[in-house]
Amino acid sequence: YRVNAIVLDKTGTITEGKPVVADIHWTPGAEDERYQSILWEIERRSEHPLADAVVQKFKEKVVNEISVSDFENQTGKGVTAKVGDKVYLVGNRALLEVSHVILDDDNEKLAVRWEGDGKTVVFFAGGGRVLALVAVADKIKESSRQAVATLHEKGIDVYMLTGDNALTARAVAD
């Protein structure tokens, strides 16, 4: 038998598997510390690796304990939770879409720019609007580029498996 293709998982194989918050943008009116606390409390309950990056980023900044209820994983999209009677979302574009949250042009442009840089964008929304965009980066391993080049030299096609959107995946692959 001759191997002619290989599939590599992005996180932890091609990248270091240690995502960190690289950028954050709060929409006007959402810079309030209360929103940071809400985001932190929701992400603290999530099991997704990107959530841990957000938790680490805000753990020193959280000043208020927030009571979160009705926490739900939305498979492949993110999480939803309630604080008081308000529903909050943390996740990807698909979660915004199914929740009927509109992503305005400025936030869309910023998200596309970050994704083009190879970052994964996490959206935080509440009250029917986007409150923040969080860019999470996972550094590509030093050895990955050479390993992929060596496989290509041997005539082996390399495919990357990722939960990221196509733009982020393309930036990492390039």
Please annotate each region the language model reported.
Residues Y1-D174:
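Cytosolic catalytic headpiece
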